[in-house]
Amino acid sequence: MTGLRWATQFCPSAKYILKCDLDTFINLPLLTRFLPIIKGKVRQFMIGHGHEKQLPPVLREGKWAVSDHLYPFDYFPPYLIGHSYAMTSDIVKHLLSVSDFIPLIPAEDAFITGVLARIIRVPRLHFDGFAHDNHVCLPCNIVYNEDITMTKMSLSRLLLLWRQISMDDCLAEELPLIRNQFSNDSVAIGDIFWYSRK
């Protein structure tokens, strides 16, 4: 929530807000072409990789544990995986105002893109090009604009990947090379689907 407050204070003219983990690479050239295309179809939205389960279970033990006094339900609303997701900036003030009345849940992605997003009724859109744990993303997928984000990367790999994007070239050993599916600034809306409208 602090990051969203910071963004509204220091980036008031931003059209989009991106949340990403420190070990996540963002293909900014592709993302900056991609988001306006979506906004042309959907005025307000969150987009990322939807949780694999339509009713994501609330974990009561482990790293992502949420106590039942904070969140007494067995399932979260559908939410976007927290490695990386983007949203139109005009929904942030609504998220912040609602968050003042809801106990903060330590699972940030479930809280912001699940609980709060459901309350303000913002569409959450799933796109496979955003990182998630079960997706094998090769560096060439980023370089040749198949994927927008890649996660669990070391600093040296992040720098190497940026150099490869800048040169529009990929290391030969990093197989499947499919050229730039977004180069004409269009995206098949069929590749993106409503994760949850509720």
Q: Model-derived features: where do they sit?
A:
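Secretory-pathway lumenal glyco-enzymes, predominantly type II signal-anchor Golgi glycosyltransferases
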Residues: 1-198
